[in-house]
């Protein structure tokens, strides 16, 4: 069961979703890719224009989070499980010594 802010945000994304349900996965995946590109675009402008685009990057990352959260909901994946799975995957790519050092730091 999802609780706390994760449940609140997932419910928010359900109630604010406005797209054709019959092609939900396709719409969400394309939206996620588009928003990730907008994060990259904001960063590119930061470099090119020598300005701080942190606020724009935060806004675009929020859109990425919205799409990612909707995809987690559609695939019945808890965001916390996604995080744990990703940690495990990344630790498995480390040498045993690196993984041990990481665990001891954390």
Where are these regions (language model features)?
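Flexible "arm" and connector segments at domain edges
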Residues: 1-106
